[in-house]
């Protein structure tokens, strides 16, 4: 569920207005700083913002129902030839992320052959969890489940949970009582020494060719929104704490320490490392997939 207002459906265009770019936004708490920043800087007025889960936003982008937006890393890698990556903006971590977790009733090494529930809202976190368990020699019996911890644990020995439900399990002791909590961001960092990127911001290649000025405008607005939100993190956390079941200190730890909104050389190295370890015919993208950025550069 979105934590801020979202466009429910397409709005019929008014003939005398120029169409604004249709921009997909993740409706999780992890994107709240960017949403706050867009409102504070006025960038929100320059786009038609549509909020949903990473999976739904990515599907709409690939279908042409959005011009640009957030897309889970796995879906971007599978469709890299159709998309252009916007530099210096991403959603990731460089250590514990707090909102992408494996919650288990037993040590991870005991999950071999055991039922493990995979949340249905993000393919990237699911694939990362599978990689991390395989690295430990564990091959569970996976099944997909709605992102509800109680439902997951009623049917499984462990569950992969992301987004707001995962953050709630992390910060609310009663929700994770008796469960072992493993942070996917921290596990990846210990394994590779690199940051992990869960979602990137991309534009459709045909839209970039048709409206390069709009793409640059949205890119500039996102960077300004991020920087404004980070410079006013105390205000963002205090506002969010007034209507969320978390204290401002917990939100500050999440927004400013856990989440990483950058896409620089180390983050790109993390993406290419993930592609190298996860890529192949079965995944729908090659291990050496090329990342094409808006500034014309490529990374591999």
Language-model segments: which ranges?
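Beta->alpha turn/N-cap motifs
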Residues: 29-30, 53-54, 65-82, 87-89, ...
């Amino acid at each position: 569920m979105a934590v801020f207002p979202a466009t429910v459906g397409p709005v019929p265009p008014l003939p005398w207005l120029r169409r604004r770019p249709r921009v997909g936004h993740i409706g999780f708490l992890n994107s709240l700083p960017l949403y706050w920043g867009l409102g504070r800087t006025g960038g929100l007025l320059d786009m038609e913002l549509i909020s949903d889960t990473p999976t739904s936003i990515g599907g709409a982008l690939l279908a042409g129902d959005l011009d640009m937006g957030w897309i889970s890393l796995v879906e971007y890698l599978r469709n890299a030839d159709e998309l252009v990556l916007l530099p210096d903006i991403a959603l990731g971590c460089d250590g514990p992320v707090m909102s992408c977790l494996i919650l288990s009733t037993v040590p991870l090494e005991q999950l071999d052959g055991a039922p493990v529930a995979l949340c249905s809202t993000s393919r990237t976190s699911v694939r990362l969890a599978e990689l991390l368990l395989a690295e430990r020699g564990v091959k569970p019996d996976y099944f997909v489940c709605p992102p509800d911890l109680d439902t997951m644990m009623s049917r499984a020995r462990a569950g992969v949970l992301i987004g707001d439900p995962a953050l709630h399990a992390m910060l609310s002791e009663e929700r994770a009582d008796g469960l072992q909590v493993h942070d996917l961001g921290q596990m990846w960092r210990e394994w590779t020494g690199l940051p992990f990127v869960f979602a990137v911001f991309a534009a459709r290649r045909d839209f970039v060719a048709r409206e390069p000025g709009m793409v640059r405008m949205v890119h500039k607005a996102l960077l300004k929104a991020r920087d404004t939100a980070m410079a006013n993190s105390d205000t963002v956390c205090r506002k969010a704490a007034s209507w969320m079941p978390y204290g401002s200190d917990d939100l500050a730890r999440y927004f400013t320490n856990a989440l990483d909104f950058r896409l620089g050389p180390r983050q790109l190295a993390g993406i290419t490392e993930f592609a190298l370890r996860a890529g192949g015919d079965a995944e729908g993208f090659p291990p050496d997939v090329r990342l094409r950025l808006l500034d014309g550069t490529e990374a591999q």
